[in-house]
């Protein structure tokens, strides 16, 4: 289970506008949740929902 949402890690779940899920995919927005990424990070823009500061982005590292 993801401690921040009611889903099993890696499974789909429904997320609100402010996505707190870290280990699951959000069915409602069809994207994985991650920190907000710096400008120019195409990978993050395509598959993530912002949930944190850009300097803590992990999906574009």
UniProtKB/Swiss-Prot annotation:
A divalent metal cation 2 binds at residues 7, 13, 15, 26. Keywords: Metal-binding, Metal-thiolate cluster. Residues 1-29 are annotated as: Beta. The keyword Protease does not apply. Belongs to the metallothionein superfamily. Type 1 family. Class I metallothioneins contain 2 metal-binding domains: four divalent ions are chelated within cluster A of the alpha domain and are coordinated via cysteinyl thiolate bridges to 11 cysteine ligands. Cluster B, the corresponding region within the beta domain, can ligate three divalent ions to 9 cysteines. A divalent metal cation 5 binds at residues 34, 36-37, 50. One of its GO terms (biological process) is intracellular zinc ion homeostasis. A divalent metal cation 4 binds at residues 33-34, 44, 48. A divalent metal cation 3 binds at residues 15, 19, 24, 29. One of its GO terms (molecular function) is metal ion binding. Residues 30-61 are annotated as: Alpha. A divalent metal cation 1 binds at residues 5, 7, 21, 24. One of its GO terms (cellular component) is nucleus. Pfam families: Metallothio. Metallothioneins have a high content of cysteine residues that bind various heavy metals; these proteins are transcriptionally regulated by both heavy metals and glucocorticoids. A divalent metal cation 6 binds at residues 37, 41, 44, 60. This is Metallothionein-1B. A divalent metal cation 7 binds at residues 50, 57, 59-60.
């Amino acid at each position: 289970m993801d401690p921040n949402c009611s889903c099993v890690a890696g499974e789909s779940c429904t997320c609100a506008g402010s996505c707190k899920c870290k280990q699951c995919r959000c069915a409602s927005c069809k994207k994985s949740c991650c920190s907000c990424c710096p400008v120019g990070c195409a990978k993050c823009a395509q598959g993530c929902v912002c949930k944190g500061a850009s300097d803590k982005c992990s999906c574009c590292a």
